[in-house]
């Protein structure tokens, strides 16, 4: 898929995985981080089985209850980036945009997602900080 950006043409590569392991998905996300060529944007779409994902600097015991998670079959994973603790399951679709800094634009990337949803007949809106609601 090709688009345009203020810096010129952009190639959009969409990668969707069927894996639901948070460890495989976060590992692939980390690998893809270094793979965007100049002028290329990678959109990575993925889902996890029930998992709490915490940020690089978070304390597991301050953010969640590991014993209860184990009883409920909820996995725990840590991403290499910062940010808060989030719950993932098969009811949400995670997306990661990967691009060199000249092409990186959160508002632009969210608009790509909204336009794609609209083409599928799914209304959506930007809500909160970097979130989409459908």
Task: Describe each model-derived feature in a short phrase.
Residues 1-104:
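N-terminal lobe of the biotin/lipoate ligase/transferase fold
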Residues 90-134:
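Catalytic beta-strand/loop module used to bind and position nucleotide/cofactor moieties
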């Amino acid at each position: 898929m090709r688009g345009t950006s203020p810096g010129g043409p952009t190639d959009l590569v969409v990668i969707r995985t069927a894996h639901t392991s948070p460890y495989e998905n976060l590992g692939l996300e980390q690998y893809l981080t270094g793979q965007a060529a100049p002028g290329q944007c990678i959109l990575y779409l993925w889902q996890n089985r029930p998992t709490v994902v915490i940020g690089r600097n978070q304390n597991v015991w301050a953010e969640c209850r590991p014993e209860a998670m184990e009883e409920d079959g909820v996995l725990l994973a840590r991403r290499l980036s910062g940010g808060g603790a989030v719950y993932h399951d098969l009811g949400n679709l995670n997306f990661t945009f990967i691009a060199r800094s000249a092409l990186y634009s959160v508002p632009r990337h969210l608009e790509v997602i909204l336009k794609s949803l609209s083409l599928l007949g799914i209304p959506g809106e930007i809500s909160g900080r970097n979130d989409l609601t459908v």
